[in-house]
Design a protein with these regions (language model features):
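Integrase module of LTR retroelements
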Residues: 1-314
């Protein structure tokens, strides 16, 4: 059994009702038009991007799916355009995406809430490998959920910008945070070499000791830390906080149940600071989602080629 969305099929059918696209198709079939191609599935494509007809309902469905579903969580206009332009093409696409996002009431509310000046930030050295140098911060003041969570712990890899969101309570002890870090982060990425945090130095030092206690090691380790995040890390934290707060406006008191999808949405969306999605930097390609179903399916990279491409991208 092959699972695939019906959206592409509906776009192909609707292309036949669009006069402009039919004119282009006729030119392609006559060998006149070179920028456009007819794909093996019968769709008209521009640079391998499927051409979306001038159908307001169809375009609205695509924009809605790319902006405010559980796995996208109100991405900004630039991120939406970067993501969608890899798969879809239509006239004035960038402008229509910007207009769609500008009209989103949830986005307007969140953007207005976090306007605040930032201090002087010191640049940090670029890491040489994934998840060895991390940034951590806490998003507090969140509504208490039925599970009693009222904060989110944000942990970001400074190289790939990939991140994890962990629901917590403000009153969690350092020992409990260390055990949670070991359970959710160490098992996937190992132990960090440096920790960047806006928290005071005592917090980082005590957290480091608690982490090694949770690991059960008797070896003595030391780690570097920075008392203030760099510009890129602070921006990443702000993006994640915005996504959290939009989710809260949509999901209300059950926001912690949606954290896995918020995490996925962030990691699978374009980040200007690295020129790709965090998943691409981490794994070599973006992960499959309903809106990127066919895009991922057409790229089959395995073994050494996948590793090499991931290394080249970062």
């Amino acid at each position: 059994m092959r699972v695939q969305p019906t959206l592409i099929e509906r776009i192909i059918v609707a292309q036949n009702d669009d006069p402009q696209l039919m004119k282009i198709r006729n030119s392609v079939e006559a060998g006149v038009q070179s920028e456009f191609k007819i794909h093996e599935d019968g769709s008209l494509r521009f640079d391998n991007r499927i051409c979306v007809p001038n159908d307001s309902a169809l375009k609205h469905e695509i924009l809605q799916e790319a902006h405010q579903t559980g796995y996208t969580v109100h991405l900004g206009g630039t991120k939406m355009y970067r993501d969608l332009k890899e798969i879809y093409w239509w006239n004035n696409m960038k402008r229509e995406i910007a207009q769609f996002v500008a009209q989103c009431l949830v986005c307007q509310q969140v953007k207005a809430e976090h306007q605040r000046p930032t201090g002087l930030l010191q640049p940090l050295d670029i890491p040489v490998w994934k998840w060895e140098h991390i940034t951590m911060d806490f998003v507090t003041g969140l509504p208490k959920t039925p599970s009693k969570n009222d904060a989110a712990w944000v942990i970001v890899d400074r190289l790939t910008k990939s991140a994890h969101f962990l629901p917590i309570r403000v009153g969690f002890t350092l020992e409990r945070l260390a055990k949670l870090y070991m359970k959710e982060i160490v098992r996937l990425h190992g132990i960090p070499v440096t920790i960047v945090s806006d928290r005071d130095t005592r917090f980082v030092s005590q957290f480091w000791k608690s982490l090694h206690k949770a690991l059960g090691t008797k070896l003595n380790f030391s780690t570097a830390f920075h008392p203030q995040t760099d510009g890129q890390s602070e921006r990443t934290i702000q993006i994640l906080e915005d996504m959290l707060r939009t989710c809260i406006l949509d999901m209300k008191s059950s926001w912690d149940e949606h954290l896995p999808l918020i995490e996925f949405a962030y990691n699978n969306s374009y980040q200007a600071s690295i020129g790709m999605t965090p998943y691409e930097a981490l794994y070599g390609r973006r992960c499959r989602s309903p809106i990127h179903w066919d895009d991922v399916g057409e790229r089959r990279i395995l073994g050494p080629e996948l590793v090499q491409q991931a290394v080249e991208k970062i």
